[in-house]
Swiss-Prot record:
Cellular component aspect of the GO annotation: cytoplasm
Organismal lineage: Bacteria, Pseudomonadati, Pseudomonadota, Gammaproteobacteria, Enterobacterales
Keywords annotated in UniProt: Chaperone, Cytoplasm
SUPFAM superfamilies, sorted: TorD-like
Signal sequence segment: none
GO biological process: protein complex oligomerization; protein folding
Protein name, per record: Chaperone protein TorD
Compartments (UniProt record): Cytoplasm
Major subcellular site: cytoplasm
């Protein structure tokens, strides 16, 4: 990636972590359709590999704004995709895709982080990976820890995530009939791939 700063990438990861961690409330629903978010999406589209994914997300948001009971419908989508059994869902856990659920715990320890008691999900939840990536990108921007160490940990985290994120995104596309979370997962998939290639 060339046009986005490490802080901006950190913000994108933090934003995605928030959206994948819990159902959207009314305030978040208003925010994603705001002029401020439109500016943010324009900035993201300045990064060519992200353009199509951001356009897809904007289209799903535009459709969302005219949907009756949008928040309730989106909550039902969230529940159906991320909280049910894996038969017709896209469970947001590394272990659901036959990955080592202990890997994220090792990465968190290496980064000097731990999961919050406020987040009542297993440590291998997608949002934890994204929070870790956000933290690492912010750390790169601060310059207080050697960049080589942070970058090595960032690469390990991206490698672990790339093991199961494509299947997760495919399941979102397959089972999210409305398409908001499918579009969100596609943006995440492209972002992670771009970030990984940036080595």
């Amino acid at each position: 990636m060339t046009t986005l700063t490490v802080q901006q990438i950190a913000c994108v990861y933090a934003w995605l972590a928030q959206l994948f961690s819990r159902e959207l409330d009314d305030e978040q629903l208003t925010q994603i359709a705001s002029a401020q978010m439109a500016e943010w999406f324009s900035l993201l589209k300045s990064e060519p590999p992200l353009t199509a994914a951001v356009n897809g997300l904007e289209n799903s948001i535009a459709t969302l704004t005219v949907r009756d009971d949008a928040r309730l419908e989106l909550a039902a989508d969230f529940c159906g995709l991320f909280l049910m059994t894996d038969k017709q869902a896209a469970l947001p856990y590394a272990s659901a895709y036959k990955q080592d659920e202990q890997e994220i715990k090792r990465l968190l320890v290496e980064a000097g982080m731990e999961t919050s008691g406020n987040f009542n999900e297993p440590a291998d939840h997608l949002a934890i990976y994204l929070e870790l990536l956000s933290h690492l990108h912010f750390s790169l921007g601060e310059g207080t820890v050697p960049a080589r160490r942070i970058d090595g940990l960032r690469q390990k985290t991206l490698t672990a995530l790339r093991e199961w994120l494509p299947e997760f995104a495919a399941r979102c596309r397959q089972y999210d009939s409305f398409g908001f979370y499918a579009a969100l997962s596609q943006l995440l998939l492209v972002l992670v791939e771009c970030d990984y290639q940036k080595r």
